[in-house]
Amino acid sequence: MKVEHRIGVQAPASVVWDIVYDLDRWPEWNPLYTRVAGAIRYGGTIKLQLALPGQAERELVATVIDWSPNEAVHWKTSLLAGLVRTIRYLEIEAMGETGCIFSNGEIFRGLLGPRIARQLRSSLRAGFEALGEAVRDRAEAHWRAQGGGATLDAR
């Protein structure tokens, strides 16, 4: 089972990537992950404080399984002795030189994965939406500050 949020960003994919890749600054703007430690590198461990709306915050330990500059980072988690396995992703799809789509979501696997996903679906969607909006707002502000084109406010 997959839960995902996608949002258009009026800034280049490289600007979005710079924000996603800079884990040290996530606590400044990221409503979903309020603390983070680690680095984006193959096989690297990332410790995350997950703050889903309507849920108690909890710490997750994830392993980076894939990343590609300006495009994506994927990590995996395993809970309940492997009964819940997830792949979490942040992906950037360039839509020209000054725009992109930012997607973030989670794929649930394992014996209890789909059940947990159904239980948390509304909180996950709200959290992923908040993260997407925060990435968009920060990227567009950075792009404007760098002299990038004005954004259209179609929200």
Q: Which positions does each model-derived feature cover?
A:
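A short glycine-/small-residue-rich loop at the edge of a beta-strand within enzyme catalytic domains
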Residues: 7, 55, 126
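A conserved amphipathic terminal alpha-helix motif
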Residues: 107-155
